[in-house]
Amino acid sequence: MKKIAIFAGDGIGPEIVAAARQVLDAVDQAAHLGLRCTEGLVGGAALDASDDPLPAASLQLAMAADAVILGAVGGPRWDAYPPAKRPEQGLLRLRKGLDLYANLRPAQIFPQLLDASPLRPELVRDVDILVVRELTGDIYFGQPRGLEVIDGKRRGFNTMVYDEDEIRRIAHVAFRAAQGRRKQLCSVDKANVLETTRLWREVVTEVARDYPDVRLSHMYVDNAAMQLIRAPAQFDVLLTGNMFGDILSDEASQLTGSIGMLPSASLGEGRAMYEPIHGSAPDIAGQDKANPLATILSVAMMLRHSLNAEPWAQRVEAAVQRVLDQGLRTADIAAPGTPVIGTKAMGAAVVNALNLKD
């Protein structure tokens, strides 16, 4: 039996998670996965119930699970809370508690939504990128850090640091991912300037010897940012550190022009969390307008990475493609003046497109 912890969160979170749960339940029943799903609170919903964005019971639930599904957290309702108690802190603490060190973000162009991209169709038509970002090190967590005043002048400082074990474990994740794709991996660094990323390049090159079937290349981060716009289809797997990955994964997500379609996975040793990359969209919460496809595709990633159910992951992804082929659209991905369907209807359409009666 596999245990799944489900945190719907805030805003549109409960709606999109409910739609994704429909798909997961249908797959579970058809594939006899034996899943046990348990719901918990995180973010603003947890604040409302317990005055804590991540109650101890929620963290325990997540740590006992084989995988976590998250909807979205945050919203203006909780803006007045002090920073340490904001809904987003619940998400950060959850990631830290689970020791999630690898973030996987696909950026795939759906041919049915080609016109949604801000770039010309010929540039993005074949884009299918996976950004693998290290989550626990780098300048975001390095010490020392702080603000100080010296001789009457304010000074801020941060420390960029990685050790070789941190680099090696994220590199293995990226190379394994590349083996299941087009077998190309581009490691992004700034090795011409930063000693930290010089070590990064050395260790990634060492790890590459374990994966002779994967073609490794290296690229400086400034060039990578340019190439993502100039010729994005050249990339398969992009591997990079925390700060560079933070920036490049957001850039890559915009290539698609449809943030409501993009899932993500955060992986640790034996634990993982799956969530859409979009926010809680409180302006449309409770109106059956949200696009659940990113969350449904996050379920597909969970089937692939945590449940050893690759054929079913592919089947969910194919069902999403089939729904788009049928012309079904939520408001965020619909062309002006075309019909739209709601969150519930889109979830039901994906379940139907699984063709489980075949």
Curated annotation (Swiss-Prot):
State the EC number(s): 1.1.1.85
Q: Where is this site: Important for catalysis?
A: Y140, K190
Chain segments annotated as coiled-coil in the UniProt record:
none
* Superkingdom of origin organism: Bacteria
How is this protein's function tied to pH?
Optimum pH is 9.0.
One Pfam family, short name please?
Answer: Iso_dh
| GO BP annotations listed | L-leucine biosynthetic process
Q: Which residues bind Mg(2+)?
A: D222, D246, D250
Quote the subunit structure annotation: Homodimer.
Q: Write the protein's name.
A: 3-isopropylmalate dehydrogenase
| Annotated gene | leuB
